[in-house]
């Protein structure tokens, strides 16, 4: 945890928070924080700054928070990824978020096993936890946009252009020996096909 990610439910006053659970255990057991210890903090989908531990017990930690700086900008990259195996899905999601990708679309295609869509890793709680862990790692409090599309052809024909906006669209293809386009890197939508 490189940044303490705070949610509105943590606040017990205008600039005071109380945390428990995983985030508290990280401060208490791993960092061994004591009153006066400073750490980076960010408010979910809001500003970043710092926090100072004011009280810590085996069950919870209280901190004073000062978050007034704007969050770091996202990379000008959007991803469209064929839905990978469930074990790989959370790794792909985590890696993309830690690299600053702000928009990710997971897509159905012919080689995607239909059973992947019923995996418990695609339910809200594992998604939320993976996203929060990735945001804590990269010190960015802004939740990326993650969408799922079950139909390949309608997405490519009807939504891809609006999803990509004015960005250039690149398709990562394993059979092409040509290097990627040269020149300045601007907004890019990168399409990544299925495993195998």
Identify the residue ranges that each predicted region occupies.
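A glycine-rich beta-strand to alpha-helix segment
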Residues: 174, 182-196
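Structural motif
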Residues: 3-4, 16, 38, 61-62, ...
